[in-house]
């Protein structure tokens, strides 16, 4: 049985197939998961993730069950593996938005239903699928290659995009502050994948260097959930990494900006640049619905083969 915990577990062909199927489902909705059930476990609050998953399973003909931390005996000390065994035996899919990736891995180890990573501190793979669909729609993949820059924190979005770019053979540049680094194990994996795919990946501390000649610019919030006590320090460390008019002028003339939201204007992106690219950004958010539909169908098909 296949889970969706990180894009590392998926081939180039599988990733592109998910994006293409999402595009088809966007054009022609189908009830492909009649009477299937999705359990949604949230340790972290969400707007877009809950909307995307709940609507996806509903529009596919299934049902969603929302479970917060307070709804589960996990909050009272029940082992993760026991909760996984119970929920996994009752539903068809489990979506988890968690604080610790290790809990996600343990849940998947014991669940009889496929587990989907809807966000952990290490990865945010469903968001990257939505980004890829958006890039496809804006014709930013030419001859199988997209030229992408990620500017900001070396967080779960950066990790997931690094992996995707390495597998897909993209040109991908990262710019982060000097006292930040990419997870070494994830970086090593990406470098090995790049040798296979032909991806061109670079890392610097200069946003202008990373942005040069890029068609897609990606940024994210500097202060993730749970880091509120670090806000003042991080804002100071990241102040040179805002995406503003000067920054976008270094990218290609028709470059698009992506942001997984929520966006904090005046910090990671200027108000002017955000509004200039708002149509793309909010379509990016909407596209989460369609990639989740494709993902659920994929996992259902994989499970049916066993």
Swiss-Prot record:
Residues bound to carbamoyl phosphate: 46-49, 73, 97, 124-127, 260-261, 288
GO molecular function, one term: ornithine carbamoyltransferase activity
Localisation per UniProt entry: Cytoplasm
Pathway: Amino-acid degradation; L-arginine degradation via ADI pathway; carbamoyl phosphate from L-arginine: step 2/2
Superkingdom, taxonomy of origin: Bacteria
GO biological process, one term: arginine biosynthetic process via ornithine
InterPro entries named among the record's database cross-references: Asp/Orn_carbamoyltranf_P-bd, Asp/Orn_carbamoylTrfase, Asp/Orn_carbamoylTrfase_sf, Asp_carbamoyltransf_Asp/Orn-bd, Orn/put_carbamltrans, OTCase_ArgI
Family in the record: Belongs to the aspartate/ornithine carbamoyltransferase superfamily. OTCase family.
NCBIfam families membership: orni_carb_tr, PRK00779.1
Job description of the protein: Reversibly catalyzes the transfer of the carbamoyl group from carbamoyl phosphate (CP) to the N(epsilon) atom of ornithine (ORN) to produce L-citrulline.
The protein, known as: Ornithine carbamoyltransferase
Source organism (scientific name): Campylobacter jejuni subsp. doylei (strain ATCC BAA-1458 / RM4099 / 269.97)
